[in-house]
């Protein structure tokens, strides 16, 4: 059985990737980061997801608040946007070099497991415009890790990005097929009791469920107008 490290954030995408890797016969080692993010509830979700799949979650603590310069790690407000404005520019929720840091640590962890594959739930279609979610980034990062690690020199490092060219609705459909427990997930950038329904992450998540003809059954403080209209038209009982 091929071993692989899977980066797990507890949101919509990474649990789908985890389920995908398991369904393809990998021995998966989930890895999450406590990096000083305001939405620490995602770590609770990661733990619940790993409990669901009977997997041991490794959490590594790194304090990216020391770097700051992001609405997720600094005293910067999380913006409330609309769907049309998402992806037009690099948003303030971008954490500087986060995927580079995470993938580097994942590669180090993989070396200790004698594993040379990493799974990550990045997406380059319905996303916020982060530079470290682009296909060309992952290609170059794969090259760098293959050159800069012991196991990479022997076998190469492979970064698997199975959701890279999928829309959010495609991801939801795949997740339903794989029976991902989306009720346990958390995508919101705000660390409140309920998802805000207004940040980029909430909007893209709800857009995905809407376009998949599905219903997102986590709790929200409020729904955006496009999702309210969708629920009314679909006659969902929960609305």
From Swiss-Prot:
Gene Ontology molecular function: ATP binding; ligase activity, forming carbon-nitrogen bonds; zinc ion binding
Residues that hold ATP according to the record: 8-18
Catalytic class of the enzyme: ligase
Binding-site residues for Zn(2+), renumbered to this chain: 188, 196, 199, 202
EC number: 6.3.4.20
Entry note: cofactor: Binds 1 zinc ion per subunit.
Record bears the keyword Ligase: yes
Origin: domain of life: Archaea
Name by which UniProt lists this protein: 7-cyano-7-deazaguanine synthase
UniProt lineage: Archaea, Methanobacteriati, Thermoplasmatota, Thermoplasmata, Thermoplasmatales
């Amino acid at each position: 059985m091929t071993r692989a490290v899977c980066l797990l954030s507890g949101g919509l995408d990474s649990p789908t990737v985890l389920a995908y890797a398991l369904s393809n016969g990998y021995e998966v080692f989930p890895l999450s980061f406590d990096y000083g993010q305001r939405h620490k509830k995602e770590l609770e979700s990661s733990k619940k997801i790993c409990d669901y799949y009977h997997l041991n979650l490794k959490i590594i603590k790194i304090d990216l608040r020391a770097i700051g310069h992001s609405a997720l790690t600094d005293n910067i407000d999380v913006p409330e946007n609309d769907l049309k404005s998402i992806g037009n520019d690099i948003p303030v929720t971008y954490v500087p070099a986060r995927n580079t840091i995470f993938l580097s640590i994942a590669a180090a962890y993989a070396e200790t497991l004698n594993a040379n594959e990493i799974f990550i739930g990045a997406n380059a279609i319905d996303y916020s415009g982060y530079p470290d979610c682009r296909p060309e980034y992952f290609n170059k990062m794969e090259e760098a890790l293959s050159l800069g690690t012991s196991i990479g020199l022997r076998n190469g490092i492979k970064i698997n990005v199975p959701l890279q060219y999928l829309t959010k609705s495609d991801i939801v459909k795949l997740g339903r097929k794989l029976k991902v427990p989306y009720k346990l997930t958390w995508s919101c950038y705000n660390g409140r009791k309920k998802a805000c329904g207004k940040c980029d992450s909430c909007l893209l998540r709800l857009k995905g469920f809407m376009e998949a003809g599905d219903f997102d059954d986590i709790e929200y403080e409020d729904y955006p107008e496009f999702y309210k209209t969708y629920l009314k038209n679909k006659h969902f009982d929960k609305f």
